[in-house]
């Protein structure tokens, strides 16, 4: 009967308790085949998935954004875990002992810790980057360049290497001897459960708290920005229009304009040419004509106005000349002008007038430039609405992706780190199989991440499909 002895091993950023046996055979043949099949499949899916992520960002320009460069770095870490860490740990589980020697053991542990810590650092960078994007939208994007992203990614990897690699590789030389048996593989300075728990606090619990707080702020700020930039509906536009018409743009007393004022009204638009006066006065009429304006007066009015106490603003009165004259021709607009006439809509309230202004075509000849101007303004408005909608869609897409990544990280890493906490106070409370499952869950996080990108980002999903189906011509158009 095998004699199992619990020992300490490694798991990502912490240590895991492994078992060894005197007979060097922990599982039956069927069990070993099953374990190798499952773990080998997970390793293959992890490698393929993260290669797809890296290729997608490389070949699709729509995915070449600062945020996705951070995901590229995270995919590199996940790829290393899938290609090396998963398979080496599977060998350790199936064999029941470490068969590859001390040098390979230390190299594996150093690689495992550095890569796992780099993954956590990348998650922190993604969270902080998104937090500053939504809380400082005017100042931070100017500094958020590709160069800055590269420096942050390099800092994450260098810091992870400095923190773990020298200590793992050279601790035995610092203390003067190697205390890890040849048939086992674990970090020598983490053999104390209290030290292991301290590393778990620094490497998992603290980052999780920081990322959770940041995500809450990101979510609240994103909702606020999306609501603020939401396109106005018809009711809101109508309400604003009515408010504008009711606002006192111009208040004035109703007075009779001085002589010659009406003659100058035609030039107030600034784009109408003053036509020469007619050679002969208008034809005689037996009585005076009256042209009453109820609620509007035009900027091209040429008659004198006369004060009237009724609700109409003015009454236009024409005198009766003595000699006939040819019919007046309509005044021509300047061909170079792109403006139309200005109509002043006026309402009288007591002794004051409330006036609003709107642009209307003066003549058929002026309708075309006015229509061009209107079309340009309409096009600008449509572009602004489209940009606001695109921005809101990007906000939701990035926020969903970050949420999925953080959720996957917390769900897969929490079981093992809870066991680390329990093991600090009770080293015999957790079965060896449970330790192994918790350890593997940390690795499974690297398998889940590419699925999170595809589920939360349609562009990633389409690019994955084009790459898998070898539809390379469609990759550049995937959105």
UniProtKB/Swiss-Prot annotation:
<dbReference type="GO" id="GO:0040012">
    <property type="term" value="P:regulation of locomotion"/>
</dbReference>
<feature type="transmembrane region" description="Helical; Name=2">
    <location>
        <begin position="69"/>
        <end position="89"/>
    </location>
</feature>
<feature type="topological domain" description="Extracellular">
    <location>
        <begin position="423"/>
        <end position="436"/>
    </location>
</feature>
<feature type="transmembrane region" description="Helical; Name=4">
    <location>
        <begin position="149"/>
        <end position="171"/>
    </location>
</feature>
<feature type="transmembrane region" description="Helical; Name=1">
    <location>
        <begin position="32"/>
        <end position="54"/>
    </location>
</feature>
<keyword id="KW-0675">Receptor</keyword>
<dbReference type="InterPro" id="IPR001432">
    <property type="entry name" value="Musac_Ach_M4_rcpt"/>
</dbReference>
<keyword id="KW-0325">Glycoprotein</keyword>
<dbReference type="InterPro" id="IPR000995">
    <property type="entry name" value="Musac_Ach_rcpt"/>
</dbReference>
<keyword id="KW-1133">Transmembrane helix</keyword>
<feature type="glycosylation site" description="N-linked (GlcNAc...) asparagine">
    <location>
        <position position="13"/>
    </location>
</feature>
<feature type="topological domain" description="Extracellular">
    <location>
        <begin position="1"/>
        <end position="31"/>
    </location>
</feature>
<dbReference type="GO" id="GO:0045211">
    <property type="term" value="C:postsynaptic membrane"/>
</dbReference>
<feature type="modified residue" description="Phosphothreonine">
    <location>
        <position position="459"/>
    </location>
</feature>
<feature type="glycosylation site" description="N-linked (GlcNAc...) asparagine">
    <location>
        <position position="8"/>
    </location>
</feature>
<feature type="topological domain" description="Cytoplasmic">
    <location>
        <begin position="129"/>
        <end position="148"/>
    </location>
</feature>
<feature type="modified residue" description="Phosphothreonine">
    <location>
        <position position="477"/>
    </location>
</feature>
<feature type="topological domain" description="Cytoplasmic">
    <location>
        <begin position="457"/>
        <end position="479"/>
    </location>
</feature>
<keyword id="KW-0812">Transmembrane</keyword>
<feature type="disulfide bond">
    <location>
        <begin position="105"/>
        <end position="185"/>
    </location>
</feature>
<dbReference type="GO" id="GO:0016907">
    <property type="term" value="F:G protein-coupled acetylcholine receptor activity"/>
</dbReference>
<feature type="modified residue" description="Phosphothreonine">
    <location>
        <position position="463"/>
    </location>
</feature>
<feature type="topological domain" description="Extracellular">
    <location>
        <begin position="90"/>
        <end position="106"/>
    </location>
</feature>
<dbReference type="GO" id="GO:0030425">
    <property type="term" value="C:dendrite"/>
</dbReference>
<keyword id="KW-0807">Transducer</keyword>
<dbReference type="GO" id="GO:0007268">
    <property type="term" value="P:chemical synaptic transmission"/>
</dbReference>
<feature type="transmembrane region" description="Helical; Name=3">
    <location>
        <begin position="107"/>
        <end position="128"/>
    </location>
</feature>
<comment type="similarity">
    <text>Belongs to the G-protein coupled receptor 1 family. Muscarinic acetylcholine receptor subfamily. CHRM4 sub-subfamily.</text>
</comment>
<dbReference type="GO" id="GO:0045202">
    <property type="term" value="C:synapse"/>
</dbReference>
<dbReference type="GO" id="GO:0007187">
    <property type="term" value="P:G protein-coupled receptor signaling pathway, coupled to cyclic nucleotide second messenger"/>
</dbReference>
<feature type="compositionally biased region" description="Polar residues">
    <location>
        <begin position="294"/>
        <end position="304"/>
    </location>
</feature>
<keyword id="KW-0628">Postsynaptic cell membrane</keyword>
<feature type="topological domain" description="Cytoplasmic">
    <location>
        <begin position="55"/>
        <end position="68"/>
    </location>
</feature>
<dbReference type="GO" id="GO:0007165">
    <property type="term" value="P:signal transduction"/>
</dbReference>
<dbReference type="GO" id="GO:0007197">
    <property type="term" value="P:adenylate cyclase-inhibiting G protein-coupled acetylcholine receptor signaling pathway"/>
</dbReference>
<keyword id="KW-0770">Synapse</keyword>
<feature type="transmembrane region" description="Helical; Name=6">
    <location>
        <begin position="402"/>
        <end position="422"/>
    </location>
</feature>
<feature type="transmembrane region" description="Helical; Name=7">
    <location>
        <begin position="437"/>
        <end position="456"/>
    </location>
</feature>
<dbReference type="Pfam" id="PF00001">
    <property type="entry name" value="7tm_1"/>
</dbReference>
<comment type="function">
    <text>The muscarinic acetylcholine receptor mediates various cellular responses, including inhibition of adenylate cyclase, breakdown of phosphoinositides and modulation of potassium channels through the action of G proteins. Primary transducing effect is inhibition of adenylate cyclase.</text>
</comment>
<feature type="topological domain" description="Extracellular">
    <location>
        <begin position="172"/>
        <end position="193"/>
    </location>
</feature>
<dbReference type="InterPro" id="IPR000276">
    <property type="entry name" value="GPCR_Rhodpsn"/>
</dbReference>
């Amino acid at each position: 009967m095998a004699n199992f002895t619990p020992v300490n091993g490694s798991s990502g950023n912490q240590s895991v308790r492994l078992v060894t046996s005197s007979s060097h055979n922990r599982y039956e043949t069927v069990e070993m085949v099953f374990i190798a099949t499952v773990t080998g499949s997970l390793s293959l899916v992890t490698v393929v998935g993260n290669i797809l992520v890296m290729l997608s960002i490389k070949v699709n320009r729509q995915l070449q954004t600062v945020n996705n460069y951070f995901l590229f770095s995270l995919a590199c870490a996940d790829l290393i875990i899938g290609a090396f860490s998963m398979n080496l740990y599977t060998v350790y589980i199936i064999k029941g002992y470490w068969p590859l020697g001390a040098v390979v053991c230390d190299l594996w542990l150093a690689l495992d810790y550095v890569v796992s810590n780099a993954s956590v650092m990348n998650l922190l960078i993604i969270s902080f980057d998104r937090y500053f994007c939504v809380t400082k939208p005017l100042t931070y994007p100017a500094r958020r360049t590709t160069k800055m992203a590269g420096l942050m990614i390099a800092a994450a990897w260098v810091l992870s290497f400095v923190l773990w690699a020298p200590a793992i590789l050279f601790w035995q030389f610092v203390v003067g001897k190697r205390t890890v048996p040849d048939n086992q593989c674990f970090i020598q300075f983490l053999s104390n459960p209290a030290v292991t728990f301290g590393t778990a606090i620094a490497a998992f619990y603290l980052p999780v708290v920081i990322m959770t707080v940041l995500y809450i702020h990101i979510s609240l700020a994103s909702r606020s920005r999306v609501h603020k930039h939401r396109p106005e509906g018809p009711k809101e536009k109508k309400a604003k229009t009515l408010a504008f018409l009711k606002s006192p743009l111009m208040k004035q007393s109703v007075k009779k304009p001085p002589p010659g004022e009406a003659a100058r009204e035609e030039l107030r638009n600034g784009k109408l040419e003053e036509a020469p006066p007619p050679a002969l006065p208008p034809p005689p009429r037996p009585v005076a004509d009256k042209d009453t304006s109820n609620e509007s007066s035009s900027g091209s009015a040429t008659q004198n106005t006369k004060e009237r106490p009724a609700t109409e603003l003015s009454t236009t009165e024409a005198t009766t000349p003595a000699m006939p004259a040819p019919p007046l021709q309509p005044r021509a607009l300047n061909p170079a002008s792109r403006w139309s006439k200005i109509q002043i809509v006026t309402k009288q309230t007591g002794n004051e007038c409330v006036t609003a202004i709107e642009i209307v075509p003066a003549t058929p000849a002026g309708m075309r430039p006015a229509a061009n101007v209107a079309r340009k303004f309409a096009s600008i408005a449509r572009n602004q609405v489209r940009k606001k909608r695109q921005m809101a869609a990007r906000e939701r897409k990035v926020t969903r992706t970050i949420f999925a990544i953080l959720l996957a990280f917390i769900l897969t890493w929490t079981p093992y780190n809870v066991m680390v906490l329990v093991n600090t106070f009770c080293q015999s409370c957790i079965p060896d199989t449970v330790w192994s499952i918790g350890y593997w869950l940390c690795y499974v996080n690297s398998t889940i991440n590419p699925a999170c990108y595809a589920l939360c980002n349609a562009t990633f999903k389409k690019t994955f499909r084009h790459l898998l189906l070898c539809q390379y011509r469609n990759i550049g158009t995937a959105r």
